[in-house]
Amino acid sequence: MKILFCSSEAFPFSKTGGLADMAYFLPKSINVLGHEIVVITPYYEGIKKHHETMTYLGTKTIYMGHGEVVVNYYKLVYESITYIFVQNMHYFEREGLYGYHDDAERFAAFSYAILESLDIIEFYPDILHINDWQTSMIPYLLDKHYRHQSFNYFRIHTLLTIHNLQYQGDFDKDVAKFFNTDFDYTYIHFDRVNYLKAGIERATKINTVSPTYSKEVMTREYGFSLDGSLQNRINDFSGILNGIDDQNTFNPKTDKYLIKTYSVSNHKSGKNLNKQFLLEHFGLDKNLDEPLIAYVGRLADQKGLGLMEYCLEEVIQYSNAKFILMGSGDKAYEDYFRYLTYKYPNKVGNYIGFNEKIAHIIYGASDIFMMPSRFEPCGLGQMIAMKYGSLPIVRETGGLKDSVIPYNKYTQEGTGFSFKNYDSYDLKEKLFEAINLYNEDKKTWQILVKQAMKSDFGLNQMARAYEELYKNIIGEKI
């Protein structure tokens, strides 16, 4: 099969979130399975440093709205995967990736540029794998402007992967002028243009990044007003759980960032050496027998920071647990965790921002990892934590529910702890349950740690699921 993977960001060249990681790991894994896959992504300002290693392929003029847009195409092969970069200085050579007043125009141009690229890059895919709102107009534009041009276009199928339904590409109606068509309700939602809705309406198949999230987004609670559109495509909609690179990037046996690497058999001594370093680094009490709770991620309401704010201080006051946080985001949450660190300097540490080395050490040192998300399409932090022997406390939503097996005190089954309701009391109860188990029943705790470390969230499992979906899509009639 031939797949053109269309992404508005791609690690290691550009990144704001998990989409960039998927644009790196999934193509590599699909390639290993023997399929041809090419990644196409914008040429952002930060990509200039790679320019000397690129090959210029050609230029296209795109007629969009009332003007012309000139784009250049560059090729770079990185770790055996071909990357195509779409260059337009006006649209993409800026400091950030998103959040500009002309995002609708920028990503309409990117979508056209992808469809115009096939003859220049000499790659005619069976499937255009599009991701999130930034490329969701592609199926519509393909149908309206390209299918009739040649068999190479006519035969193309499309797969839309929704990584987070909250972000939809919602714009004023005047951006419809970029599509070079008569007004069409395919992309209209509440009297506005909605890029993601167009993708949902027109893609051959749709998926999201966990089975549970695929069910949740068809409800009013999680559907962000597109639940009806998704329900209409229920037979073409599925969920595939994301994976992590647990062989190289997130492997405690080989992790170059850890103070001491370790495996399932010697995890206790290895984790203690990492904990010792981390406690010293943050200036906390050095008692290694006390549980260390951690959080690594965005400081946002979606991630359950509101629940943490309501209950964490009580946990710190009335238990022997210590807490370390790494992340950035909402300034109110940043200030709150600075306050906690100031008030409890021997028990709380924070790193406002991100540091790759320290993040890996936090996974390696911590005993308990918090992810009490309001909603979570997939989540990778809980998977990484389990591979490093840090037991996650999660809310039963999205990929958290699909990946964490809750502790059963009667059977000793489990790889973490979970609670159902979005309620700070429920989170507090689970925190105290985990802390008490850590303090009072070391044998059971070690059983859970070993079970967590043996969890399989590898990329091959994810790639096989996408391979099966690709095959299913190609069997569909256009």
From Swiss-Prot:
Gene Ontology annotations of biological process type: glycogen biosynthetic process
Ranges that cross the membrane: none
Keywords: Glycogen biosynthesis, Glycosyltransferase, Transferase
GO molecular function per UniProt: alpha-1,4-glucan glucosyltransferase (ADP-glucose donor) activity; alpha-1,4-glucan glucosyltransferase (UDP-glucose donor) activity
Keyword Glycosyltransferase in record: yes
Reactions catalysed according to its record: [(1->4)-alpha-D-glucosyl](n) + ADP-alpha-D-glucose = [(1->4)-alpha-D-glucosyl](n+1) + ADP + H(+)
Pathway: Glycan biosynthesis; glycogen biosynthesis
CDD domains: GT5_Glycogen_synthase_DULL1-like (cd03791)
EC number of the protein: 2.4.1.21
SUPFAM superfamilies xref list: UDP-Glycosyltransferase/glycogen phosphorylase (SSF53756)
Residue sites binding ADP-alpha-D-glucose per the record: 15
Family the UniProt entry places it in: Belongs to the glycosyltransferase 1 family. Bacterial/plant glycogen synthase subfamily.
NCBIfam families: glgA
Functional note: Synthesizes alpha-1,4-glucan chains using ADP-glucose.
The protein, known as: Glycogen synthase
UniProt organism field: Acholeplasma laidlawii (strain PG-8A)
